[in-house]
Amino acid sequence: MRTKNVCTFQLILFPKVRSYIPLPLILKRIEITKNCISTRGETTKTSVTEKLSEEKTVVVEPVFGFLKAHFHSTRFSEEATKRRKRKWALLVVILRKYTARNSKQKRTKKTRQKGVRSSFIDERTPFSFIFWLVLFRPLFNVLPCSAQSLFVQEFFITSPCLVCPAFPLEQNVSAFAPSTNGTKTKQMITITPMIRFIVVQLLTLRFSYRTVKGISPLRRRAWFFLWFNRSKCFCVGSIHKRNKNKADKQYQTEYSFHCCSTPIIFILVR
């Protein structure tokens, strides 16, 4: 049984450790640290740890206490959760890096002006993909009806989602709006992602029932799930402040509006 003195020493020195450390060992550890300070480096840290590891007796809880005592962390500890989060974040970065198109090759930098933040012009267009899709569309007519129902519908559903870039087009809307102090300040009209999300959903539902005619209910459900999740990817935008002039107190905001061109591909092809 643990005595009161041992419990108090353990709470003071090691509040998070679930192991039994006897009182003489705690006192010896304090003496060793005092000697280490008094002798000014004559006894090194390695010798101190060796002495402690030889005489330490650990009584731990089963399974998780053993893991915590010997490996210093379990799956449910704080260090392990941080490690898992870092792994998932790295996986997301890798997937986004290798699924999107190479932005360095497809984007050109604007000429820098005085007081203007350097931005990018997005030159990625889906016309090459539309041309490829229209060119090879008659090849699928050779397949029988069963093969077409199995492969062609999934091909036309998934291929634009995978091949087309996430943000194919960009559009900036600007206007003059009065500010609070009465002076006219040029600023961009901010279009909220929710409005864009509704527009994408309407474009999707406009031709969805005609496209999924003859598909099984399970496959139709998967079709809608894929489309609705894909449309959420287009609802990513940000407002950037730029041209901040303290003398004129003018704040020009820019909003990048990324249009969804994937439903347009379906309308043109189908």
Swiss-Prot record:
* GO terms of molecular function: type II site-specific deoxyribonuclease activity
List the keywords (alphabetical). Answer: Endonuclease, Hydrolase, Nuclease, Restriction system
Q: What is its EC number?
A: 3.1.21.4
- Reaction it catalyzes: Endonucleolytic cleavage of DNA to give specific double-stranded fragments with terminal 5'-phosphates
Q: Is this entry keyworded Nuclease?
A: yes
Root EC class: hydrolase
Its GO biological process terms? Answer: DNA restriction-modification system
Q: What does this protein do?
A: A P subtype restriction enzyme that recognizes the double-stranded sequence 5'-GATATC-3' and cleaves after T-3.
What is the protein name given in its UniProt record?
Answer: Type II restriction enzyme CeqI
